[in-house]
Amino acid sequence: MTDFTPREIVSELDRFIVGQADAKKAVAIALRNRWRRRQLDDALAEEVTPKNILMIGPTGVGKTEISRRLAKLAGAPFIKVEATKFTEVGYVGRDVEQIARDLVEIAINIVRETKREDVKAKAHAAAENRVVDALVGPNSSEATRESFRKRLLAGELDDKDVEIQLADSGAGMQMLDIPGMPTGGAGVINIGDILGKGFGQKTKTVRMKVKDAYEPLINEEADKLLDDSQITADAIKLAENDGIVFLDEIDKIAARSDARGGDVSREGVQRDLLPLIEGTTVATKHGSIKTDHILFIASGAFHVAKPSDMLPELQGRLPIRVELSALSEADLKRILVEPEASLIKQYVGLLATEGVSLDFTDDAIDALAKLAADFNASVENIGARRLQTVMEKLVEDISFTASDRSGQEITIDADYVAEHVGTLAKNADLSKFIL
């Protein structure tokens, strides 16, 4: 869990996301409140629940990216789900409790990776012994083993093929659903696990290079040193206290005030979300998880529906409202150059692998931003995603012939942009007349 201050969290988000100061401020405060809650005594901490956030703004302005970067920064279990993927309990489809189950699985992976790092030195030594066994046999003399160990550490044997025994996860027999029980959770039996425990762990022989054998062997040896029950307990605790759920397309399940009749994927899903966001206990195959302290960030464009079209109870469970503004031409220009992994840096890096040097002039960047802004205004406003369309069209010819142009330096200016992307603008004018 990070102990960054809100100001530090915002400056960290600024490295990757342009603008949207209000949204960054809201999520920074929400993350800091988690740290503050940890400083309280247990009785008071139990009463402090996260203030869930509703982000309102057009597509492509940074709603998802802000949440994703926040979770990465916090090292927290994070899951992004589309609200439209779920159906009301009792109908065919995924029910909303699957969100909590998936969050536990993500938390288990995070905890397992952390604990693997703690035992990596021991696991590496054990993996090294298994590679030496595969090279010279388990009954070889100590002198022979030491000789091969030195060559192994020096990297002389990296490209040599070895046969190693790895645990077989049993892909053939996986899961059995128990009728009447929730899918993907407590109502699922892993037949492979049962048979594995009854008849001992199955192994399979795999042939690979020495340098490629280390990773699976280290993971296998590390898992032998870990306590699965402790990992599960820690993961459930992590998911309960630090979990972040990003509910996208929340506006698509808001029934418009002028709509008539019920809808399985709308009001019913909203009703099912109420206890999950408010705080409930969900049964998973790893144990029960309480959702009281999980942070929910809902987002939607709300082009057709309005936030007030959602159930009043659901509105009340999303008390913090943040409006994200549409991107201007100046914002699009900043997005092209300012983030650490901006689009221009990505394309320059990709083509540099072929020996092609790309150089973008300032007027080219201005022209790209103007084109993207014009497309958004005239066709459909898809925000920063429009830049990907424009950039891909711009470097299409260079990308196709890059392997034949190694060593060349190519300067992209405003004229080059007009020549290669200008046709898109003409086609866009006609697109509205095509069915």
Swiss-Prot record:
Primary location class: cytoplasm
GO biological process: protein unfolding; proteolysis involved in protein catabolic process
Keywords tagged on the record: ATP-binding, Chaperone, Cytoplasm, Nucleotide-binding, Stress response
A Gene Ontology molecular function term of the record: proteasome-activating activity
Function: ATPase subunit of a proteasome-like degradation complex; this subunit has chaperone activity. The binding of ATP and its subsequent hydrolysis by HslU are essential for unfolding of protein substrates subsequently hydrolyzed by HslV. HslU recognizes the N-terminal part of its protein substrates and unfolds these before they are guided to HslV for hydrolysis.
Homology family: Belongs to the ClpX chaperone family. HslU subfamily.
Summary of subunit composition and partner proteins: A double ring-shaped homohexamer of HslV is capped on each side by a ring-shaped HslU homohexamer. The assembly of the HslU/HslV complex is dependent on binding of ATP.
Protein name: ATP-dependent protease ATPase subunit HslU
Protein species of origin: Maricaulis maris (strain MCS10) (Caulobacter maris)
Upper taxonomic lineage: Bacteria, Pseudomonadati, Pseudomonadota, Alphaproteobacteria, Maricaulales
Gene coding for it: hslU
